[in-house]
Amino acid sequence: QKAKEEVSKRRKTNLGKTKLNPSVGTVIVKNNTVISSGKTSLNGRPHAEYNALKKNNNYKGANLYTTLEPCTHFGLTPPCVNIIEKKKIKNVFYAFEDPDTRTFKKAKKILNKKKIISKLIKCKNYKSFYDSYFYNKKFNLPFVSAKIAISKDFYSINRRSKWITNKQSKKVVHLLRSKNDCIFSTSKSINIDNSLLNCRLNGLDNFKPDLFII
């Protein structure tokens, strides 16, 4: 349970900030103790498994828990299954199969051939986390989040009030901005609101999506 909680924390940290790669969390457990952890780096490289295993620890016989099936293909870096074998990991557990056709259902076969037990452990409460990644891989389209604020009388603005959202909804919007690559807005909306359309949350203010004005 502790490993699941730790891996869940790691996967969330860089959500929306790993470019084309999904945000993944990985923890290494040996003798019932978490000895290392990793997450996908900003811009997507290195992967979480590599970041967890690059530290100078004795990983022989350890269990690796990760949120997504380890990659099996060569890209800008070697596949994660290679370093898993090199570090002599005993068991690999992952929450979802990677829909990327270069990896889909291949990690288990490769690792099992190397006598590394690999198991898919489905975690339903993680599923929505990868909605954007799964959607992109399935339809080859970007995942779109819509922000709409409407008053009780079904108007978005009136002459008396400039904003109809509250502090909590504004925080949610800023968080969405930090997780998305770009924002589409109309020139009318920007001119009326004088919108900055950036993220103004502490620690996330460096993550500003590209702006496209319609």
Segments predicted by a language model, with ranges:
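Glycine-rich helix-loop-beta junction characteristic of Rossmann-like nucleotide cofactor-binding loops
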Residues: 56-58
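Anionic group-transfer/hydrolysis microenvironments
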Residues: 25-27, 38-39, 69, 149, ...
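Local cysteine-cluster metal-coordination motifs and their immediate loop/turn environment
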Residues: 24, 39, 46-47, 64-83
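Short loop/turn microsegments at loop-to-beta-strand junctions
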Residues: 22-24, 35, 144-146
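Zinc-dependent deaminase
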Residues: 1-17, 31, 60, 74-214
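A generic fold-level signal
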Residues: 19-21, 47, 206
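Acidic, glycine-enriched active-site microenvironments
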Residues: 17-27, 61-62
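N-terminal beta-alpha supersecondary unit
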Residues: 26-30, 34-54, 122
